[in-house]
């Protein structure tokens, strides 16, 4: 991974942290699942399904499912979505490429989900021409 890729990944992480501070009052964002499935909420089940799709290389399907299940009135869904995009950001470029996905799409997804929650103004935070 080159310096440019590392820079873009860090900038995406900074974008998510800025949204977390603004919308959730948190310095870091990390939607964590309970230890056992019997303790899962509906949101936990959605997140688990999304992660399973990503791990199977079905990133576009995971993103489609995210939008279908997103509740713009529940900030837990914002945290879940941002955590998912952070997870995608940690994937290497080859994995993203094999899934027909890109870092630019990560940025677009972050901005789109944020806009669903009324959070705007970050559209130019990441220079996607470097992606």
How does the language model describe each region?
Residues 1-74, 90-131:
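N-terminal alpha-helical interaction modules that lie
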């Amino acid at each position: 991974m080159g310096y440019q890729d590392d820079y873009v990944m860090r900038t995406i992480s900074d974008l998510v942290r800025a949204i977390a501070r603004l919308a959730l009052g948190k310095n870091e964002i990390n939607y964590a699942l309970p230890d056992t499935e019997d303790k899962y909420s509906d949101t936990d089940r959605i997140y688990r399904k999304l992660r399973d799709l990503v791990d199977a290389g079905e990133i576009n399907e995971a993103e489609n499912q995210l939008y279908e299940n997103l509740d713009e009135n529940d900030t837990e869904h914002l945290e879940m979505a941002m955590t998912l995009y952070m997870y995608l950001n940690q994937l290497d470029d080859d994995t993203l490429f094999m899934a027909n996905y890109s870092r630019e799409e990560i940025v677009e997804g972050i901005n789109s989900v944020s806009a669903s929650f009324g959070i705007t103004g970050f559209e130019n935070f990441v220079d996607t021409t470097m992606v």
